[in-house]
A protein has these predicted regions:
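Acidic, His/Gly-rich catalytic cores of divalent-metal-dependent hydrolytic chemistry
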Residues: 353-358, 365-389
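Extended active-site neighborhood of metal-dependent phosphoesterases/phosphodiesterases
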Residues: 35, 39-45, 110-229, 268, ...
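Loop/turn elements at helix/coil->beta-strand transitions in domains of secreted/extracellular proteins
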Residues: 55-58, 94-99, 128-134, 191-194, ...
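N-terminal active-site segment of His-dependent metallophosphoesterases
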Residues: 8-115
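Structured segments of extracytoplasmic/periplasmic soluble domains
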Residues: 65-68, 86-91, 108, 125, ...
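Active-site-proximal segments of metal-dependent phosphoesterases and phosphodiesterases across multiple
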Residues: 205-227, 235-306
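Solvent-exposed loop/turn segments at secondary-structure junctions
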Residues: 65-68, 105-108, 139-144, 200-205, ...
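Active-site neighborhood of phospho(di)ester-bond hydrolases with catalytic His/Asp-centered motifs
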Residues: 61-63, 99-104, 133-139, 243-247, ...
Length: 389
């Protein structure tokens, strides 16, 4: 209780600050814990390193850190920010190709000044790392959880807050590409491998009397412009092994959309790409999420999308739909088993603060020569799983 009160005092923002200066000072005191970095480094040295070659792509991946201005010993809190520091510390030491965060950097339940400060801190840590990085937007990253708990429910984040703090910096790196300055689709190339990042929180920011038409935390989707951009990128993807990444799962094991809008259309587009088809992608909607576009994947050579990797669900799962592997990774954020919102998957891990089970993260190694994607988990994560690509 004393720890919580100290943290609360230090993290209380001054009125009208865009980013809380006190939050920034507090976060900059956080350091990687040697027992954690030694453990993660051991996972890399013993399990991952033997698979690394000049042709492979090796990534450090975190998802759902849910950083929050609270020094909690059993649930979401500052631990999420520290997990980023520790993962990037090891990445620097072993010279990985790419650091990826699959979204929900923050819990989005703090005052806006604090949430913006947490986002800024995380981005700055990724920027200081040696490897390039990509941070995807999660459904908590627009601070709508905070808005839900307020009586008037007005939007605490402005339209461009997240983009100005996070998204724009992804694309200031020469290794990260997009079609144009407003596209929500990014990609990274290394030799025969292409990793494409899509935004599953592609929701229009529309205000009505100060409140949002769509709650970003509750609504997930992909709009027509993003699908057009993805189509254009895929049409120019020739002789590549393609891995897709997003925050939320796009489709269920039964083939139904797992997004509120157009997850099934993303899947249909990927299947058409693998089949080298030409045709039309269309839904029955109008307005914000209506889609009607054409594609031609007949000239993409032997390119194939084999895998879609995401977080969001706070558990692990993998399944195949139309020959595409869909892989869900566990949340980095601490979820103690006594909390009501803790998933059954994390209850089984009995995750505890200041123990290895506190964290959950992954190394992913993609090998175009062995046609294999390997995932090496650490902390509250499956130690090893392999997929054909």
């Amino acid at each position: 209780l004393k720890i919580k009160n100290i943290a609360r005092k230090m993290l209380t923002p001054k009125p009208s600050e865009f980013v809380s200066a006190q939050t920034d000072i507090f976060l900059k005191r956080l350091k990687p814990r040697p027992f954690v970095t030694d453990y993660i480094r051991g996972v890399y040295d013993n399990n991952v390193k033997p698979n690394v070659t000049d042709d492979t792509v090796t990534l450090s991946v975190l998802t759902d850190t849910h950083a929050k201005a609270l020094a909690s010993a059993s649930y979401y809190g500052i631990n999420g920010a520290r997990h980023i520091i520790e993962a990037n510390n090891v990445s620097d030491a072993v010279h990985l190709d790419l650091n990826v965060h699959l979204g929900d950097l923050i819990d989005g339940s703090d005052k806006p000044e604090i949430s913006r400060g947490l986002l800024q801190f995380a981005v700055e840590n990724y920027q200081r790392s040696k490897a390039p990085y990509y941070i995807l937007e999660g459904n908590h990253d627009e601070n709508d959880k905070y808005d839900e708990h307020r009586f008037f429910g007005s939007a605490s984040f402005h339209r461009d807050d997240y983009d100005s703090l996070v998204t724009k910096y992804n694309f200031e790196q020469p290794e990260i590409h997009r079609l144009n300055p407003v596209s929500k689709v990014g990609w990274y190339d290394k030799k025969d491998i292409r990793i494409i990042f899509i935004d599953t929180s592609d929701i229009p920011y529309i205000l009505s009397n100060g409140s949002k038409k769509y709650d970003f935390k509750k609504v997930r989707g992909v709009r027509e412009q993003q699908l057009e951009d993805l189509t254009a990128i895929l049409e120019k993807t020739i002789d590549k092994h393609v891995v897709m990444m997003g925050h939320a799962n796009i489709i269920s094991p039964s083939g139904r959309s797992a997004l509120n809008f157009n997850g099934d259309l993303v899947q249909r587009l990927l299947v058409a790409f693998n089949n080298k088809d030409s045709g039309q992608l269309k839904n029955e909607l109008t307005g914000d999420f209506g889609v009607n576009l054409r594609y031609d994947f007949s000239s993409t050579g032997i390119s194939k999308v084999t895998t879609y990797i995401c977080g969001h669900m706070h558990y692990e799962k993998n399944y195949k739909v139309s020959e595409i592997n869909h892989i869900i990774l566990n949340c980095s954020a601490l979820m103690g088993k006594k909390h009501g919102l803790t998933t059954d998957y994390n209850k089984k891990w009995d995750r505890r603060y200041n123990e290895i089970s506190e964290l959950a993260g992954y190394f992913i190694n993609i090998d175009p020569n062995k046609l294999r994607l390997q995932i090496f988990g650490y902390g509250a994560a499956t130690r090893y799983v392999s997929f054909e690509i």
